[in-house]
């Protein structure tokens, strides 16, 4: 994290390289492009599908904080959710809007900052507020959570992912052995322990807070950039059961599920 970073710096960063923008070689904005982005995202991060449980939100109002280029947004809409997405990056937001047009889906998109989005009048109650890998890029996660709390109604479910401090990935970063992923170079990128995350959510007032951990990127970067999935030798040699245990205890993603009572 850059010590004097501003939210405008974060916006500029994601405008220059929207998250997952290189997940396909196809022409950006085409149906094939979006299909390949979706396939790659959920192949590398399959836990997103189970965490979101898209079919559960059929007919429900869903708000996504930080929709990016709209991959998860598309799935919510395809499974029948009444979808609203906000996004800091204008370039990312426009791709998400184009994605819905190309795919023939309905949704509402607004350019907003996670820390101040509660100033916007959504004129609806949300059954789910979802955010995956976003609010750890804010100047104040406390302010972002307060905004989410203010938007939420009694009974609103909240599902949020933030980076995990006690993780394999963070250990590699600390030792200068980091394998770059989407966040590499972002001016603001914080990580949290499960206890810190629990404290943040409970202090804000959320109830029934459940936290799990998942995701270790296991592929060689040069090959991955060429859309080939070749595991690092130590992961290739690791039994599936051991790798599952490693993800559960040292995964890069803290998956937080809570509710506003």
Give the label of every model feature segment:
Residues 130:
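A conserved beta-strand element that flanks and buttresses the S-adenosyl-L-methionine
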Residues 188-205:
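Short alpha-helix
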Residues 157-180:
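Conserved class I S-adenosyl-L-methionine
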Residues 1-35:
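N-terminal, positively charged/glycine-rich alpha-helical extensions of SAM-dependent methyltransferases
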Residues 172-182, 195-199, 209-261:
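A C-terminal cap/extension of S-adenosyl-L-methionine-dependent methyltransferases
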Residues 60-117:
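Class I SAM-dependent methyltransferase SAM/SAH-binding core
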């Amino acid at each position: 994290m850059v010590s004097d970073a501003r939210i405008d710096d974060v916006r500029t960063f994601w405008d220059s390289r929207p998250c997952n923008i290189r997940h396909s070689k196809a022409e950006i904005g085409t149906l094939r492009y979006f299909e390949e982005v979706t396939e790659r995202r959920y192949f590398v991060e399959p836990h997103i599908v189970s965490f979101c449980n898209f079919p559960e939100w059929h007919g429900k109002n869903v708000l996504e904080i930080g929709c990016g280029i709209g991959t998860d947004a598309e799935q919510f809409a395809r499974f029948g959710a009444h979808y609203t997405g906000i996004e800091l990056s204008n370039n990312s937001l426009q791709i998400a809007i184009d994605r819905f047009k190309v795919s023939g889906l309905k949704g509402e998109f607004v350019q907003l900052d996670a820390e101040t989005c509660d100033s916007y009048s959504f004129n609806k109650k949300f059954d789910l507020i979802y955010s995956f890998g976003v609010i750890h890029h804010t100047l104040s996660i406390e302010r972002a959570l307060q905004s989410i709390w203010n938007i939420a109604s009694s009974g609103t479910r909240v599902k949020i992912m933030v980076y995990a401090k006690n993780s394999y990935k963070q250990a590699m970063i600390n030792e200068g052995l980091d394998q770059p992923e989407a966040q590499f170079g972002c001016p603001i990128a914080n990580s949290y322990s499960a206890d810190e995350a629990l404290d943040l959510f409970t202090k804000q007032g959320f109830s029934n807070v459940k936290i799990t951990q998942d995701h270790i990127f296991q592929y060689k970067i040069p090959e991955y950039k060429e859309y080939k999935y070749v595991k690092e030798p130590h992961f290739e040699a690791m039994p599936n059961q051991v790798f599952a245990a490693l993800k559960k205890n040292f995964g890069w993603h803290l998956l937080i599920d809570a509710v506003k009572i």
